[in-house]
């Protein structure tokens, strides 16, 4: 075939495709139970006319709206009533968090620690978002360390290096069919339990993760929360040649918190266990102040807590002096949120979880963080998941009606179709799955939340 003929052929094909592009419906053509799709002029114009979120402008706006008159009490009152990026308070109660902050201030003065539990799905794995809140609170109220974590687990921590060996078995309340479930409901505050059946050692040292905050790497207080010990159970924490002051407190039903307080921060520590016991959590903290516990529950929609032993959870949270509980869920529910009725059922489940925490931690306040924007391919375009705005609004209404505060992450990002712009940002603030934040994006979210 001559070059001229090839050129004519290519031009003819191009002309035919251009003509098809001009007339093809944007929503495709239904034929025999299937839909034929092709790039179209209407679809192109629709994309071109769509409002695109400027991520940098959104984040700058969040910061500037908070900074204006931030040194006045009147500003804070207006912020919680009028600022679109605010934390929404139940009954518009300006004093909702007063008791929390009072306890945080007293903690440093009295040489004790108070805890903030941050539960979430995989969006907060590797200490994402939690570490920014931790850093902000510890700068203001004092404290250091990374908080609570399981003795053994399949999700690494972003702020501490942990290695375990010996007779330990890990069970979780959440996860798919590949995760092990215990034959009871005594899972503790991390929604997981590690069964000790013999000798075991858990070694701890500061993480080498480049994204970890320096304050999280510094700890001088090692604690172990456990229950149902055998008569021959023994527990010891060692760190180089340093000696520690050891205290132990046991609840009426036998949940025990043992604490090793060293005279200065340690570079490494070993927790040595022997016998039989249920290990609910290990903590690595500073001697006083605030600690924020990152508790990622991969694949969870936040509806599992009511299945955990209420007496065990109540006594655990009391021993750990928990004053704020953050629940960050909703994203994992989107694949099944196909109707308003299903969403209403989810509302009821979330309301029960909030009520559960209000019962087991009456001294704590509860804050619910809704899902981020999430992108899904529809007709070749990445758009917000169908019904996500409805889920966001329903969760907000449920939290406030149940007496919990609410922070709207979806709106903070820029609302509908904003996730695509977070993905396209340089550097990327979200991954190619259009669901999870990158470390840089998670930091922006954490900073916005911590304002």
PLM segments and residue spans:
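Active-site segments of SGNH/GDSL-like serine hydrolases
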Residues: 36, 328-334, 356-392, 408
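Catalytic His-Asp segment of secreted/periplasmic serine-dependent ester chemistry enzymes
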Residues: 310, 372-451
């Amino acid at each position: 075939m001559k070059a001229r003929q090839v050129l004519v052929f290519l031009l003819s094909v191009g002309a035919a495709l251009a003509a098809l592009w001009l007339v093809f419906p944007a929503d495709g053509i239904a034929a025999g139970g299937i839909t034929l799709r092709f790039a179209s002029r209407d679809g192109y114009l629709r994309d071109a006319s769509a409002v695109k979120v400027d991520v940098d402008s959104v984040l700058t706006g969040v910061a500037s709206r908070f900074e204006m008159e931030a040194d006045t009490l009147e500003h804070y009152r207006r912020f919680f009533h009028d600022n679109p990026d605010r934390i929404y308070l139940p009954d518009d109660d300006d004093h909702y968090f007063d008791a929390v902050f009072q306890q945080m201030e007293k903690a440093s003065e009295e040489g004790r620690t108070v805890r903030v539990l941050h539960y979430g799905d995989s969006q907060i794995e590797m200490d994402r978002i939690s570490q920014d809140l931790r850093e902000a609170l510890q700068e203001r109220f004092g404290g250091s360390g990374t908080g609570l974590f399981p003795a053994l687990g399949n999700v690494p921590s972003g702020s501490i290096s942990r290695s375990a060996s010996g007779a330990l078995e890990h069970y979780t309340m959440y996860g798919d069919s590949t995760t092990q479930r215990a034959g009871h409901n005594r899972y503790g505050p991390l929604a997981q339990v590690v069964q000790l059946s013999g000798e075991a050692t858990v070694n701890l040292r500061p993480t080498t993760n480049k994204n970890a905050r320096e304050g999280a790497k510094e700890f001088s207080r090692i604690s172990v929360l456990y229950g149902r010990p055998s008569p021959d159970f023994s527990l010891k924490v060692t760190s180089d040649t340093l000696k520690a002051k050891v205290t132990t407190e046991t609840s009426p039903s036998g949940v025990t918190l043992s604490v090793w307080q060293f005279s200065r921060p340690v570079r490494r520590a070993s927790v040595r266990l022997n016998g039989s016991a249920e290990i609910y959590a290990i903590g690595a903290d500073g001697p006083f102040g605030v600690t924020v516990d990152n508790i990622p529950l991969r694949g969870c929609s936040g509806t599992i807590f009511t299945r955990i032993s209420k007496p065990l959870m109540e006594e655990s949270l009391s021993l750990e002096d928990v004053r704020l509980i953050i629940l960050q869920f909703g994203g994992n529910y989107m694949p099944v949120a196909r109707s308003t009725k299903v969403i209403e059922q989810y509302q009821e489940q979330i309301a029960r979880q909030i009520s559960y925490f209000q019962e087991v931690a009456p001294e704590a306040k509860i804050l619910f963080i809704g899902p981020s924007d999430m992108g899904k391919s529809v007709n070749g375009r990445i758009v917000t998941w169908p019904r996500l705005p409805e889920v966001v609004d329903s969760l907000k209404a449920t939290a406030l009606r149940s007496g919990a505060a609410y922070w709207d992450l979806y709106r903070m990002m820029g609302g509908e179709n904003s996730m695509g712009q977070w993905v396209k940002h340089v550097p990327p603030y979200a991954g190619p799955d259009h669901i999870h934040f990158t470390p840089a994006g998670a930091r922006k979210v954490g900073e916005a939340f911590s304002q």
